Amino acid sequence: MKVIFTEDVKGKGKKGELKDVSEGYARNYLIPKNLAVAATSGNIKDLEAQEKSKQKKAEAELQKAKAMKEELEALKIEIPAKAGEGGRLFGAVSTKQIAEALGKQGKKVDKRKIQLDEPIRSLGYTKVPIKIHPEVVATATVHVVEA
C-alpha cells in the first residue's frame, strides 16, 4: 500500500515522502497514529502543492538573502575601541559588538551568523564574512577606530 508520511518514522520514511509499505502496517499502525495518510490522488496533489509552495518560499528567502548581502557589503561598519601603542587594542572586537553596530545602522543580524575566526585585536579595516543563508555569504568591512 502506498502512503504519504506526515511525520518522520525512523527506518521507514521522512515527512512528505511517498512510499510503499505493507497493508497491515499502514492500516494498523501508521494511519491510526497519524504518521501517514493513504496515497490517494487528492493527497498526492496536496503533497505536490505543498512542495511547490515550499520551493517558492525557499526561492523568496534566497532572493531576500541576496538583497541583504548587497546592503551589508555596501555598509561601512565603524567600531570605536581603546588602543595602545602600535594599534593594538585593549581587549578585542567580538561578533557581539559587530552585530550591535549593524543593529544601530538598521540591519538586524544574529551574532552567530557572523563568522569571525578570532576576535579583531588591531585597528584598521577587516573583512568579516556573514552567513545570511546557507547559500549566501556576505563579506562586510569592519573599520576599528581609536576611541
Curated annotation (Swiss-Prot):
SUPFAM superfamilies: L9 N-domain-like (SSF55658), Ribosomal protein L9 C-domain (SSF55653). One of its GO terms (molecular function) is rRNA binding. Pfam families: Ribosomal_L9_C, Ribosomal_L9_N. GO terms for biological process: translation. It comes from the Bacteria. Belongs to the bacterial ribosomal protein bL9 family. Binds to the 23S rRNA. NCBIfam families: L9. This is Large ribosomal subunit protein bL9. The lineage of its organism: Bacteria, Bacillati, Bacillota, Bacilli, Bacillales.
